[in-house]
Amino acid sequence: MPKFFCDYCDVYLTHDSMSVRKAHNSGRNHLRNVVEYYQQIGQEKAQSVIDSITSSYAAEGQAVPNPAMVPPGAYPPPFGFPGQFPPPPFGIPPPGPGGAAMPPPPGARNLPFPPPFPPSSGPMGAPPGAGPAGLPTPPNMPPNMATPPGSAPPPGQFPPPPGGFPIPPPNFQGGFPPMPGAPGQGPAGFSPSPGPGLSGPPGGGSGPDAPGGFAPPPGMGPGGFSGPPPALGDKR
């Protein structure tokens, strides 16, 4: 029958039974030998354990460099988003032809982008002369007037002149009134009488009864010039 050997006490037990082993392990001598054994192992291997821990920390420090030891001019390693996956190793590609735009991370708010600018001309399918966003031309207004200032004219029309006066359409009847204060012109619809030595308008006479002419005002002579009023005339 094999015997049980106690490594702490360095002795063989008389019987290899559970009752004998329990009685030996609870003895005073066995407990003292166990404490001394572990104390001896700790004193001998304390320095080796310290060296192994130091070397393991040094190996981890080489894999992940200290941010304080980064040389000047170098970029620090990118950090991941909080509570999400780490960023790609080559960074986020910029949007455009070189790389597609990446969607925002989950849980992040949408960035406020500026709204698109409205088109300068009317949309496709709008009638000619329509304003921006397909507004119709107001009634009784020339087509050129519907175009707002600063925008391109509709197809088939000329841009307005720089002075600001629109060009009348081909079927526009009548002309523009003369500029006020122009020399040699009177009010609209008034034809001045010819001066002395000048012939009257074609088809009209100089007298009051001439067809197509105008009668001179009271007190005006036949030559077109009137004398002084009776109260201011010279005494003869």
UniProtKB/Swiss-Prot annotation:
CC per GO annotation: commitment complex; U1 snRNP; U2-type prespliceosome
Biological process, per Gene Ontology: mRNA 5'-splice site recognition; spliceosomal snRNP assembly
Location within or outside the cell: Nucleus
UniProt family annotation: Belongs to the U1 small nuclear ribonucleoprotein C family.
Subunit structure: U1 snRNP is composed of the 7 core Sm proteins B/B', D1, D2, D3, E, F and G that assemble in a heptameric protein ring on the Sm site of the small nuclear RNA to form the core snRNP, and at least 3 U1 snRNP-specific proteins U1-70K, U1-A and U1-C. U1-C interacts with U1 snRNA and the 5' splice-site region of the pre-mRNA.
Function: Component of the spliceosomal U1 snRNP, which is essential for recognition of the pre-mRNA 5' splice-site and the subsequent assembly of the spliceosome. U1-C is directly involved in initial 5' splice-site recognition for both constitutive and regulated alternative splicing. The interaction with the 5' splice-site seems to precede base-pairing between the pre-mRNA and the U1 snRNA. Stimulates commitment or early (E) complex formation by stabilizing the base pairing of the 5' end of the U1 snRNA and the 5' splice-site region.
Protein's name according to its UniProt entry: U1 small nuclear ribonucleoprotein C
